[in-house]
Amino acid sequence: MSKISTTLAISLMIITGVIGLTIGYITNPQYKINMYDKTSMDFGRADRTLDLRYINAMIAHHRGAMLLATAASTQTQRPEMKDLSAMILKNEPGAIAELYQWKKDWYGDTKEVKDPIVPNLGSYDEKFDLRFLNALIAHHEAGLVMTKDITTKSSRTEILNNADAVDTFLNTTLKLFKDWRLEWYKI
């Protein structure tokens, strides 16, 4: 009987631990913040599908911005964050449509790109905008890694022009986000 009780006790402890970790992961946005692993942004060698890999990654990147903006648009109280979310939700679909068109025209590929997993920003509180800014900063830094990689490997003019435009935009807005974070949160 004591052997069964010990086994049962250990099993219950393991189950409780797993449940606790799961609840912590779901409810604490910081567990998900490391989703932008910059070590995984390499497009590999310059072969015939290099540009396709960039296109798919950039579609997912733009969708990630939209998912973050959608979450923020209903939570934030700051006018700057509301305007930023509205701008993202207005502009990103056009960029995505252009990338899908290139994908279809150049590769005959009409497969939809899977949405990325983005950080859970949590419910509104005094640190909500900080979480949103941190997520956008990480998102932009990942995008910059992508544009740097593709500009050293691709020879297609449209891809290089896209990467240059994205790089310029990301650098400009990254500075703005860091300025807001410093002004609002002294970080």
What are these regions (language model features)?
Residues I15-T16, G20-I187:
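All-alpha RGS (Regulator of G-protein Signaling) helical domain and cognate RGS-like helical scaffolds
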Residues M1-T16:
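N-terminal Sec-pathway targeting helices
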